[in-house]
């Protein structure tokens, strides 16, 4: 078994940033990713445009270019592939981490690859940078397991001419509803709040509000889906329950980090926010030797950490780890 100074779990932008900063300091690291490199970005809508500018997505001091003011998904995927190759990061794709055993300085990370073959990686330190996009917030209603229920919106074409419901009231729900509407789907928006969230981007909100006002997109506020059936959905409204004809349901209800994995591995979480307790200077958890990076630091408040600020976690953690390893301290001396 190859021994590494650090195992980084997750190869999204934050995980890549950790790998880069460790390599810059001469700290050996392997990144283990359950999907492909930047798997969450790969699963974004096909034609998605970021709400930010290229320089705010950059890692490793490698410039990102875009044909427009805001980069799109394809440009981001190309950029992170290029950065990974430039730094020659050791990334094990399509390999899922099952558990972490051992203690600070003598961990073993256990995983299984896509063929089910087990692997073990001895390491002195571990960084959790798993993100949250692979765990949707479920509706917990009958019928949610039907194939017509979709938690990850990709593109509108397959839903042309169909009756679709979009659940949610934030950016992803608004964008999904508009995209489906403009492509010829019959769209109903269902949201438990009084109105669309104020967090919906300023250039999107008036657009969807006008479509709702004109009746082009039907909307039920202060409402929720209570039952999903093969060709319909039952919606609970303030007045009564309404049965709607339905072909597809897009549950744009957000996502959450793998809190169970952290708890099972001795990482204590705040009971209310579910934020892990970490040292703010090193992002080390209360389980000594395990550091957290990216959105995991925010617990259930996933709207606080983005690529734009999570990318800086790598430098902070790498500096702390490099300073703690005996061979690096000896080299400095």
Q: What do these predicted ranges mean?
A:
Residues 144-158, 255-304:
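FAD-site-proximal beta/loop scaffold in flavoenzymes
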Residues 11, 130-131, 253-254:
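Glycine-rich, N-terminal phosphate-binding loop of Rossmann-like dinucleotide-binding domains
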Residues 5, 28, 163, 185-188, ...:
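Residues at the starts of beta-strands that form the adenosine-phosphate
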Residues 11-89, 174-202, 271-272:
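Beta1-alpha1 glycine-rich phosphate/pyrophosphate-binding loop at the start
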Residues 2-14, 162-167:
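Beta1/beta-strand and adjacent pyrophosphate-binding region of the FAD-binding site
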Residues 294-332:
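A conserved FAD-binding loop/helix module that cradles the flavin
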